[in-house]
Amino acid sequence: MLVEDHRNISCGGDPFNYLKSVMKAVSIQLDQGQDAKILLLKEKFPYTRGTFEGLARTTGLVLQEVSEKENEVIVNVRKQKN
């Protein structure tokens, strides 16, 4: 499983576009059927499950789970099989 840790990033731009880039990069790195875990901070990425699901879908990923632990968000995705 690929783990992408973006908890301590300093993003001066739009966090939504940053997250979109992260999802696209994860999609490129994974083979079909592989999983990834993306670690984020809730204060920097205050999005709902629906937002994460939409971003995953547009980048060829399937959202498996979104969980919160204290101020962290853990997003689990899988690369779609064609």
Residue ranges of each PLM-predicted region?
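Residues that cap or initiate secondary-structure elements
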Residues: 10, 44-46, 81-82
